[in-house]
Amino acid sequence: AYRNIRTCIECGVAAVSGTTGWTDRLGELQELCRERGGALFYASNYCLGVNLMFRLNRQLAAMIDRVGGYDVRIEEVHHTQKKDAPSGTAITLAEGIVENLAGKQGWVNLAPGIEHAANRIERSGEAPADRIEIRSVREGAVPGIHTVTYESEDDVLEIRHTIKNRRTLALGAVVAAEFLCGKQGVYSMDDLLRNA
């Protein structure tokens, strides 16, 4: 994906990317956009509802940090053809929690036989206390379900998003492309939602 995005920017074509696994090189693409007057819009998920969940998730993590007494975990469910785990959406949710909840330093995916290279601890069983457990499930033709669960000794608080069909992903990508028209620089769904 990185090479394709770079080629688009070098050729003067605005790029809209929904792939993950390349954002460790985002700084290089930001510099290239500055040098070439290029434009890039990237998101781990183009569903507008998921992106609202990302914002809610960050805010909730900050509130839980102030209140204390809760642990957090994430579950993501996708169709059996999805090869990566955890999903980019689950990783984005985990990153939002790590940024706002003291004591969480990263995440661990406990799905046996499904791997993701970034920020993974090889482990089975329970997640270490300083990591967010991400459980990946692959079943049927599920387009995507993401659940963030905060649990204390006394209660459970969940936020959940279910994609009913993939049309919403295409719609979000079109909205992002329209937003990018006439712009230079690097943008994300936060920029789009901030200007909505």
Segments predicted by a language model, with ranges:
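Rossmann-fold NAD(P)-binding glycine/threonine-rich loop
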Residues: 1-11, 18-43, 48-62
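A generic structural signal for short
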Residues: 17-18, 82
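C-terminal substrate-binding/catalytic lobe of Rossmann-fold NAD(P)-dependent oxidoreductases
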Residues: 68-196
